[in-house]
Every structure is written in C-alpha cells, then in structure tokens.
Amino acid sequence: MSILKIHAREIFDSRGNPTVEVDLFTSKGLFRAAVPSGASTGIYEALELRDNDKTRYMGKGVSKAVEHINKTIAPALVSKKLNVTEQEKIDKLMIEMDGTENKSKFGANAILGVSLAVCKAGAVEKGVPLYRHIADLAGNSEVILPVPAFNVINGGSHAGNKLAMQEFMILPVGAANFREAMRIGAEVYHNLKNVIKEKYGKDATNVGDEGGFAPNILENKEGLELLKTAIGKAGYTDKVVIGMDVAASEFFRSGKYDLDFKSPDDPSRYISPDQLADLYKSFIKDYPVVSIEDPFDQDDWGAWQKFTASAGIQVVGDDLTVTNPKRIAKAVNEKSCNCLLLKVNRIGSVTESLQACKLAQANGWGVMVSHRSGETEDTFIADLVVGLCTGQIKTGAPCRSERLAKYNQLLRIEEELGSKAKFAGRNFRNPLAK
C-alpha cells in the first residue's frame, strides 16, 4: 500500500526541547513516529538539523527539518507510490535526495522520522507486529526479549553533580523472563533511593534526564558501592550485574583524562589512558561490572584496543562507532571494542540501523539498543531490540514516562508471545548462540 500523505510537526522531547514528529497516512490508517535527541553528541554522527534561530527555543527549533519533510520529502514519496513495506527503497531514496555524507541537507532527524513511520506502516500493511516486521527486514527468524540495563545513577553531562562517569547501570541477568527483570530493576531502584536518602539526604534523590539519581558524589567508586549495597538490600546479589557508560570523550583533555572535569580546570590532576584503564580493572575486580561503554575518547584508538584485549568484559562503542558502518568496520579491524551501541538517530534511518547491527553481529560483537537522553513517548526501539535479537537494551531507569513507555511495550510484547517468548538472560551478549 502506498503512502497517501505525510505531515511533520514540531513537538517536545523529555527535556522541553523541540523535536520532529511525523504522521504518515496509508489506506490502513495513521502511523506516527517521533525522533529522540542526545546530550553528548559524537562528532562522527549524522547531523541533527536545528534552526539555530536564537530568538526561538534558544536556537534549538526544528522547523527547518519539519519543512524539509513537508515540502520536499513528503511530495517525493507520495508521488513515487512506493509500498510502505519497501523500507530499504524508501530510505535509499531519502538518503539520495539529501545527497550529503551526514544527512546535513534535510537533517537526520527529518529522514529518521519518516523512516520510523514507514516501518510502523509496513508492519500493519503486512498484518504483523512491528517487532516481527523488523525481524523480517533483518532476516531473523527468531525474536528475543532483551535484558534491560537500567541507568540508576547519573553523572557526566547528564547530571549537575561532580561525578565524571555518565551512567551506572544494573542488569538483572538472572531473571527468568522480562517481567521478572522489570520487577528486580524496580525493587533495586527503590532500595537505591532509600540508601541514597539515608546517606546523602532527601535532595540527593532528585532524578536526572534518564530517571536515575544524581547524588553529589565525586568518586566513581562510590557510585558502584551504592549499587552494590542496593542490590544486596533488595536480595538480588546473585541475579544483578553492573554496567557503566563512562562517556570519556566528555572529559578527554589533550591526550589525558580529567575525572574532576566539572571543577575549575587543573591539568596537574589529569590521568593517562593506562591509569584510567587500571581504574576500570579495579572496578571489574571489586564489583560485578560486566560492561563498560565509551571507556576512552572517540579517537583514542590505541587505548580502546589495549583495554578490550585485556579486560575480559563487554566493551561497548558508542561515541567510538556512532552506529556508523564505516566506523564499525574500522573498530572491527582494530579490535577496539566488542559491542555496538545502536542508536537509530546517530545514523538516521531504519535501514542503516539494521545494516550496522548486522555488521556488528556478523563480526561476533554484541549489540545494545539504546534510547537518547532527550526522549519522547515513541516506543519504536522496544520492538527494534526484540526483532534484532540483540539481547540488551538501555532506556533509562524505571522512572519517567518516556523511559517506561519502552519498558512497558516490552512487557506487552512478552505477554503477546506467551509461551514462545525467549528472554536473553545471562546470554545477553550473544543471545542467538545455540
């Protein structure tokens, strides 16, 4: 069924910034998608087009991206009479019309909004759930429920505290199914809230952009200690492991790293990549840390390679790879990491997201699907993670509706699959392994 009409508008994300929403109409109805936005943006990612009109929304308006959809992309797609199940053809057409390497003409936020809406319409056209349509597009016969990685302590660019490292996550790998993983996550979260309140006072339980707590601690080890205590108090020491997103590019300073980057600058406290690697290894030794994302700067290739070879855990590339097939191929060649963080808006289309995922999986990597810090009520990534069988998703703490929207959709998918539902559990790094 071809597209009858496409209409885009400015809506608001969870930080009160404008973002793009797309309504796509076929004879089967209306299909709506909204685009997320990140706080820490990699320099190699597809361009999110903002108006830069300082008199409006501090320059963050997206009326140009909206206009590109309404005036250029929409008429082209409607006139071509393409079937909404032809995801790759439609995405390719938009990318060719844009004609730039990083989607800077229309904006990745324009192309992605349409791409997501097309995917949702394609599922209904085929009469299958969205996760099944995505599995078909990716060539997967199975679907798998992921382990959720709940970001429960926030630091870095996401929080107003002194903590350098951006995310401290809990992964309930010992759960029997996704519903139990949610329960464990929620119970640990509430225990953590009490632990933080007792130790730092009630105002320390205010939440950050992704629903995690942002207590004013400086030592990253203290963050891990709080998690360990909360997991123990909840009674899940044998079922929960820890993940971190360091976002080290945010505190990379002339070849070194500043773990107190939110204080006045003082080069004498910078540490070398090797010292930082040793710090991570002490975390791995003393705590159940099984996954570290962006441990080094996006161009500190040597440090990545050395760490991945010796750490023995999941090393996730986000700023390093920005979901870009060229960067992924380089990281595969250099053995820089062993897991891809998949963010649809970093590459800017459904087709390219699927290609990036397949490329990573074909090279033996894990893949973790991710939200952005500026989110909407859109739940596309919940279906995406199930259809791509990646086995792991991070979409914030079990708090704030834009985060829960994704987790609740995963609960519904598990319920719909019934006895056929498979949960990644402890195999979250390679859930398709027999």
UniProtKB/Swiss-Prot annotation:
Instruction: List, alphabetically, the InterPro entries matched.
Output: Enolase, Enolase-like_C_sf, Enolase-like_N, Enolase_C, Enolase_N
Question: Any idea of its EC number?
Answer: 4.2.1.11
Q: Where in the cell is it found?
A: Cytoplasm; Cell membrane
Q: Which EC main class describes this enzyme?
A: lyase
Please tell me where substrate binds in this chain.
H158, E167, E293, D318, S370, H371, R372, S373, K394
Q: Locate the N6-malonyllysine modifications and list their residues.
A: K233, K420
Care to name a GO molecular-function term for this sequence? magnesium ion binding
Which residue positions does N6-(2-hydroxyisobutyryl)lysine occur at? K228, K281
Give the pathway annotation.
Carbohydrate degradation; glycolysis; pyruvate from D-glyceraldehyde 3-phosphate: step 4/5
Where N6-succinyllysine occurs, the residues are K60, K89, K228, K420
Co-factor(s): Mg(2+)
Describe cofactor binding as the record notes it: Binds two Mg(2+) per subunit. Required for catalysis and for stabilizing the dimer.
What is this protein's function per UniProt?
Glycolytic enzyme the catalyzes the conversion of 2-phosphoglycerate to phosphoenolpyruvate. In addition to glycolysis, involved in various processes such as growth control, hypoxia tolerance and allergic responses. May also function in the intravascular and pericellular fibrinolytic system due to its ability to serve as a receptor and activator of plasminogen on the cell surface of several cell-types such as leukocytes and neurons. Stimulates immunoglobulin production.
Assembly and interaction partners? Mammalian enolase is composed of 3 isozyme subunits, alpha, beta and gamma, which can form homodimers or heterodimers which are cell-type and development-specific. ENO1 interacts with PLG in the neuronal plasma membrane and promotes its activation. The C-terminal lysine is required for this binding. Interacts with ENO4 and PGAM2. Interacts with CMTM6.
The name on file for this protein is Alpha-enolase
- What is the name of the gene encoding this protein? ENO1
